[in-house]
Amino acid sequence: MENSKTIKLGLIFLFLLFPFQSFAYKPTTTHAGFTQEIVDFYNFSKDEGDISKEIKELIIQGSIEEDSPSTRAINHFYDPIRNIGLYGMDSAKYWAMNELGALGETKLFEKKIEGKRVVIQGELNDFTWPKILHYYATGDEIRAYLGLGHILHLIEDMGVPDHTRNDPHMGEGTDGYYTGESPYENWTGNTQNRETMKGLAKEVLTKGEKIKILSSLESYFDEMALYSNKNFYSADSVQNSVYQYSEPGVREYDSDYGYSIDPKTGKKYKLVISTNDGYGNRIRQISYNGNTSVLSDYFVQLSPQIIVNGAGVVELFFKEAEAEKKRYKEEEKRKWEELLVRNEAQMRE
């Protein structure tokens, strides 16, 4: 327990010393690409009410900003099996619903919307789900859409095995607290961006995928986190002395790989690279000597689920935000009517 506390403090201290370190898909490349495709998939799936290009860029910007400053990334983990965040801290699911102010402040940035310059700063950096619904209800749609991007960033992170299998990856050696790097995130960061991912939403749609409809934001966290946790490995969770997950399991081996079956599609995919240590012992890894084919297979399986669940979060946002807007207007009307009654009573006295 003492060791766990030391690690937690060390992680926070390390983030403060080295703000360039990150725990996520690269925000300006992969997160931006995923958010772009989520919005496009939502638009392709709807007959009317398309999200405009301007609003789409706001949502993408919010998704990028969720990693700024990098201390926020400590809250981007959720192990759905044990219901914990990184090293037992609060999870991303909790973070999305309850702002953890000490590590939550975003940097100043400004937007120009319909010719108007808007500065987002100070206490306006609360992008939790209840808060962004409130922003929308009260007419502050700019912050609401930025906040939606922040939430989508977290959902996208639930599609990263490292984030759902409690595997921090700040880097090699002492600077990274010997947590190592994430082969999957390094690969996606170098290969997946807005340009290379363009058209992925249309591809997912043509395969018959639809917006995932769930009843709550928490359900989307569970859906994505359980899928990535149970079906994919991170580098340090193939075999781990701290906690060994019961899933995933290799269904079959050939001379080079171990394979599994995706429960969503029924398709076989590469789960691990299989090698031998020379003593008859099998070694399983997700990347080896420049071989990234397992990582590529992971992305092929994970990306459609991120897109359909992300689009579901967008759908849920508009549903709950409009309901909150209606409640807010009714409450404001009630307050106004009560004020008029009090004023009339005072005038009669």
Feature roles, as predicted:
Residues 347-349:
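Non-catalytic terminal regions with compositionally biased, polar/charged low complexity
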Residues 2-10:
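Bacterial N-terminal signal peptides that target proteins for export
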